[in-house]
Design a protein with these regions (language model features):
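N-terminal transmembrane alpha-helices
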Residues: 11-49, 62-77, 81, 106-113, ...
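Transmembrane helical elements of multi-pass membrane transporters/channels
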Residues: 22-41, 143, 177, 206-210, ...
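Helix-terminus/linker motif at the lipid-water interface of multi-pass membrane proteins
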Residues: 36-55, 124-131, 187-193, 254-284, ...
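Alpha-helical transmembrane segments of multipass membrane proteins
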Residues: 39-42, 114, 122, 156-160, ...
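Small-residue-rich hydrophobic transmembrane alpha-helices
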Residues: 54-114, 151-170, 278-336, 340-342, ...
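Short runs within selected transmembrane alpha-helices of multi-pass transporters and secretion channels
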Residues: 75, 144-162, 170-181, 199-212, ...
Length: 456
């Protein structure tokens, strides 16, 4: 038996705690690296291009999230399908899923770029760009969209690396992009005077370089899923499965796009361009801990998917317990930092005291109930990892749309800018309750099925 298949079989035999550490730590390191890579870009832009550049960058968030929605949908959908098929020992179908995911990433990445570039100015205006911030937002997005297919491929291949029992390779890919971006971005912004566009170019170059390394890994026949003839032609039932499972992360990112549009418009109306910039800074701070939690979830995905496919529900529930505990601890650390070091966090991004003051308030209020977010994310990830797409999508929508948007539409009428900040903690509390109710119901089902030897 080759090493890849042996590593895959360990998903059903190795102690769950050690296994989660083995998969989650590299994923956490990778996601931490990705969040730092995202944050350092903003720091370089804020310190090198000014407060309005930070606001211009914040205006691009909806479009970036929409692009990420398609990439996440394909990447997570494909990696979950691959994990389940490997658990069922169906290696041929796992490879076919890999090939179809590769094709989807290329098609969607290119199509999204073309459509967005054709209507870029109206899109950015709709997303909240003012006369002052539009030039920054446009300069950044023209370059980002030109390399969008590269970004799709990079993130998609990383998700599949984890499903193919190569979490360390996925971690290294993320770390390498951070290092390359951290080297190139300040060079492009300061010595080469390329401004915010230089930061975007550094990102694309870093991703392209590491994508070449990822493709080399998948060119090795020893990898449990690898490039070969006959796996790229789209197969309808495989595409449907990828989309069905990937609809949850797609919905999460797409909802972020919708919500951020409303946030930007509310902040522009009640607080101006600097309030939009403060939201951008707050987003980056929270994003670090959200991404670390996503790393926990990604560590859980192959373990939960494999054991669900193998009907080993005792191991399935154990990985859920460990993931939930870790997720809550992570977001609790984020909450402590937000409540005690908000000034220092804001100061990283800008020297503009007005922007710092607005950002302080935003960080404290927005992250008021942040520990609950960890539990909600772990629940969503669990349902996603076992292919319960509808429940996972419901939980994704509940936090970012169903509860958040009504609060966002109502509260600013009474509390102005503070109302925008308050909408998030209120939504977090309600969505946490919904997640725990659904999770408790399914935990009981799995325990009963384990005792009776039946399938869920």
């Amino acid at each position: 038996m080759d090493n890849s298949k042996q590593a895959t079989l360990e998903l059903g035999t190795k102690p769950v705690g050690k296994l989660l550490m083995q998969y989650a730590l590299p994923a956490i390191a990778a996601m931490t690296a990705a969040s730092l890579y995202n944050m350092t870009d903003s720091i370089f832009i804020g310190q090198g291009c000014g407060a309005l550049a930070i606001s211009g960058l914040a205006v691009t968030f909806p479009l970036q999230n929409l692009a990420a929605a398609f990439g996440a949908g394909v990447g997570v959908g494909a990696s979950t399908c691959i994990s389940v098929k490997l658990g069922q020992k169906d290696y041929a179908t796992a490879e076919r899923v890999f090939g179809n995911a590769f094709t989807l990433n290329v098609i969607i990445g290119v199509a999204f770029s073309i459509i967005s570039l054709l209507f870029l100015n109206p899109i950015l205006r709709f997303f909240g760009a003012s006369d002052a911030t539009l030039p920054y937002a446009r300069e950044y997005m023209v370059i980002t969209l030109a390399g969008n297919a590269i970004s799709h491929m990079f993130f998609g291949m990383n998700a599949i690396l984890r499903a193919a029992s190569k979490p360390r390779s996925a971690m290294m890919a993320s770390i390498m992009t951070v290092v390359l971006n951290a080297i190139l971005s300040p060079i492009f912004i300061w010595p080469l005077h390329m401004g915010i566009g230089g930061a975007a170019l550094a990102t694309i170059i870093a991703q392209a370089a590491v994508l070449c390394w990822q493709l080399r890994i998948f060119s090795n026949p020893q990898c449990i899923v690898h490039f070969k003839r006959g796996i790229y032609r789209p197969v309808s039932h495989i595409i449907k499965n990828i989309i069905a499972i990937g609809i949850s992360p797609f919905a999460m990112n797409a909802c972020s796009c919708i919500v951020i549009i409303f946030i930007n418009k509310a902040l522009t109306f009640h607080g101006g361009d600097l309030a939009v910039g403060a939201f951008g800074i707050t987003n980056k701070i929270a994003f670090i801990f959200i991404m670390i939690n996503m790393g926990m979830n990604q560590g859980m995905f192959p373990i939960a998917g494999y054991n669900y496919g193998a009907r080993n529900y005792d191991r399935l529930l154990r990985v859920l317990k460990y993931t939930m505990t870790g997720a809550v601890l992570i977001t609790t650390v984020g909450w402590v930092i937000a409540q005690t070091m908000s000034y220092e966090c804001a100061r990283l991004f800008t020297s503009d005291e007005t922007l710092i003051r607005i950002s302080e308030r935003a960080i404290i209020v927005t992250m008021l109930t942040f520990p609950l977010v960890g539990a909600q994310m772990a629940s969503t990830g669990f349902f996603q990892s076992i292919g319960k797409a509808k429940i996972s999508m419901l939980l994704s929508l509940s936090r970012q749309l169903l509860f958040f948007l009504p609060a966002l539409l109502v509260l600013p009428n009474f509390y102005k800018t503070d109302g925008v900040w308050l909408a998030q903690p209120i939504s977090d509390v309600i969505s946490f309750v919904v997640a725990i109710v659904l999770l408790t119901k399914y935990v009981k089902k799995f325990k009963a099925a384990q005792a009776e030897g039946t399938a869920v």
